[in-house]
């Protein structure tokens, strides 16, 4: 599942995804971002004055979804909590990986995205339904189960 996620985030040279955070009023906020897979983890450089940085400082919960694929309908999603990274050696490794893709950043804050769950939807050739889902962790906690129908 991890390799499928990597391939979907890195469809082009730089990682691309949509980051969902929680605004101060509790509503959702969605941002395009450039995730970095490096140093055994998933990271984001975020501008210090960005609304998404403010959201993550206040409430670290996030969801991250890959950009749509031009050739297939496969999807990859992760969720968890973001934590600021102040370790200079970790930042150097992640920065080198990020800039090797041609991307650039300066004094942006580095966040590690600590994963609590992931979902990969694998589709057959277009048009096909339903996809084959792979989840991590495989068995959700009872209070986190996703309902597939709308309750009356």
Question: Model-found features: residue ranges?
Answer:
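Short beta-strand segments
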Residues: 14-48, 54-56, 62-68, 75-78
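Extreme N-terminal tail/first-helix region
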Residues: 1-16, 138-152
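Generic structural signal for secondary-structure transition and capping sites
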Residues: 15-16, 61, 103, 118
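Charged, gly/pro-rich active-site loop segments
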Residues: 72-152
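A generic structural signal for nonpolar/aromatic side chains embedded in well-ordered alpha-helices
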Residues: 9-11, 56, 98, 113
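Short amphipathic alpha-helical segments and helix-helix/interface helices
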Residues: 6-7, 53, 95
